């Protein structure tokens, strides 16, 4: 009897699994809120220098004061980061068209905003930008805050991944929920930008812990036949979370209250997480079979199969877990990802795919203001496009194969982003449409690469492989915000990089072997025997893909 048969005995799709998956999915709704929170708490409102402090606004019209103190740029708008050293009252004698640009005024001495900035707060009441004046010389700090957050996600994946295998999924899930709740609360009450960044790093680490342990607990308590459906459902929870963020941000315009609103739900999830049962698989592999038997009997009781649960004993459990226990004794490491030429090709190509997908995805998603429309509306559109994108790529993966779907999604995303560079800025509808298509393609690429990577890596090192490519994705998300700084002098550079990276990685993906209808490899030797050159020409009979075969030695952990 395999463990899957044991799970069927106590009920694999009963009341317990419904409650278990539902409660574990609830925090996923709020994960997108923290990943994309920067779009709203760090939105940059229109701003310009405050007039000289010694000027009396009561005796002079405010518009005239601005004309005399803040120069106009070539676009006819007030300069954001400089003002005249002394008020130029003679400008008021010129008509509007003459004062837009005058050679003599171009040579007038200017200075930085010595008395601070004036912010047009029509869309929000406060952001970290207005709170700490993160504009002009300090504008890079906005991108740095998102980079540090993604750095926390990266560190959390490394830390919580190891701790989870040592101390269990349930304990780490409790810690992650509490860490996210407290970290988010501290972010909301930050008194300095440094404090803000420190606690955002904590939130990033907690998010990784939530992702890793939530998905582990989900897949380890459900049968193989429903993993595809459940995995798709939890993925749509993240998509729904993007829509929730837009709605909450629209209602709460203050960055502190908004941060608090998306953090408080984690206190609730922390409280009900005490109810979760530890994975029976993990308990057996860590030499605690007695507790595993108790948990299985609890599942049987909740599912109304108490009689079947009473039949389970230590001997039956250990017999069902023989294969898992044998696999756990293997001496494999991350170095095995590069052991052979075939493994090196797979690892290098997947690294490029994951890095570029995450890099371009967050590059587009974290710069909503450039589209010139309401950031709340564009957030809803960007979130909604994931729904059809994931459906389409799922169909394509089943009919055309993994490799063409992965290549096509990446190349099409890159083309959409590059074409957008050629569209005039006044054609906002077209620019937004192209960006939405590009973002949808990147979401489809994410959907594809999770399945593709899991099918390419053999069972004995699948967890190490997924951990490595996930780390590359986090690294891409860290770098993405900083690329936006290159657009200060050359606005086309970020778009060129964001568009070029997916196309290049799409070429890398072409060198990956096809896995549609192929059996899951169990060892590195299986990968070498299959061979890159023979992948498309030779298919084995009775083939099973990742969605249908139970990876009993090492369970695939996904991250959103």
UniProtKB/Swiss-Prot annotation:
Q: Do you know which InterPro entries this protein is assigned to?
A: MFS_dom (IPR020846), MFS_sugar_transport-like (IPR005828), MFS_trans_sf (IPR036259)
Side Extracellular, residues: 37-143, 192-201, 250-256, 367-374, 428-433, 487-491
Q: Which GO terms describe its cellular component?
A: basal plasma membrane; basolateral plasma membrane; plasma membrane
Q: Where is the signal peptide?
A: none
GO molecular-function annotation terms?
A: organic anion transmembrane transporter activity
List the SUPFAM superfamilies: MFS general substrate transporter (SSF103473)
- What keywords sit in the KW lines? Cell membrane, Membrane, Transmembrane, Transmembrane helix
Q: How does the record classify its membrane topology?
A: Multi-pass membrane protein
Localization, UniProt: Cell membrane; Basolateral cell membrane; Basal cell membrane
Q: Which residues cross the membrane?
A: 16-36, 144-164, 171-191, 202-222, 229-249, 257-277, 346-366, 375-395, 407-427, 434-454, 466-486, 492-512
PROSITE patterns reported for this sequence: MFS (PS50850)
Primary location: membrane
Regarding how it is modified after translation, the entry says: Glycosylated. Glycosylation is necessary for proper targeting of the transporter to the plasma membrane.
User: Which Pfam families does the record cross-reference, listed alphabetically?
Assistant: Sugar_tr
According to the UniProt topology, which residue ranges lie Cytoplasmic? 1-15, 165-170, 223-228, 278-345, 396-406, 455-465, 513-560
From which domain of life does this come?
Answer: Eukaryota
Record family assignment? Belongs to the major facilitator (TC 2.A.1) superfamily. Organic cation transporter (TC 2.A.1.19) family.
Q: What remark about domains does the record contain? A: Multiple cysteine residues are necessary for proper targeting to the plasma membrane.
The record describes the protein's role as: Involved in the renal elimination of endogenous and exogenous organic anions. Functions as organic anion exchanger when the uptake of one molecule of organic anion is coupled with an efflux of one molecule of endogenous dicarboxylic acid (glutarate, ketoglutarate, etc).
Q: What's the name of the protein?
A: Solute carrier family 22 member 6
Q: Which organism does this record belong to? A: Danio rerio (Zebrafish)
